[in-house]
Amino acid sequence: MQGFSKENFISLKYNANEEIGNQYFKQYNCQSVPHLLFVDSKGNEVDRIIGFLPPTEYLIRIEDIAQKRNTLNDYLARYKKGEISADIIAAIAMKYEDRKENDKAVEFYSILIRDYPDPSSEYYKQGKFFLASHEFISGNENALRFYVSNNPDSPFCFDAYRKMVYHYANSEQREKELSIYSEMLSLFP
């Protein structure tokens, strides 16, 4: 794995808490650490890995990245050539979501939900949650509550409440924040 990385990439490590690292973190809309960003010689993003991956999965991902396979640009090119499926559309949406290009993620998640309505699909579930979250952040305070009430078995219910709490905490709406915490304690003891 290290040999492959040394042959195919020039690795630089920056700390997001230091000035230069923080600049890159903001420039590329990074969300959390660890956050591995793969850029070409012009500084254009090729792909990213967010979080930790098991070694085998990591090697497969970096091999794909080195070949520019299964990247956003690859998926978009395939989509434009007519390779249209739930997998391709979901992959594009998730790549945009990772980049925090939320309006573009909304576009593709909306296509996924409209054209491939399979409530048992993990992609469908993720798309529904993302769209509700985006609506909430965009000002519809009922979007996530509506999502939770209509999807009580969703694996994203806890995340929906957590997103509401963080939003209210960050916007210093203490009463709403405490109200959501209270609901969470009754639902997730």
PLM-predicted stretches and their roles:
Residues 89-96, 126-131, 147, 163-164:
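Structural register within alpha-helical repeat arrays
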Residues 1-20, 32, 38-39:
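Thiol-based oxidoreductase modules, predominantly thioredoxin-like and allied folds used
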Residues 71-78, 103-114, 138-152, 174-186:
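Alpha-helical repeat scaffolds
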Residues 49-52, 81-83, 99, 114-124, ...:
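Short solvent-exposed coil/turn linkers within tandem alpha-helical repeat scaffolds
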Residues 65-88, 151-155:
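TPR-adjacent "capping" and linker segments in tetratricopeptide-repeat scaffold/adaptor proteins
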Residues 89, 95-122:
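Solenoidal tandem-repeat scaffolds enriched in leucines and small polar residues
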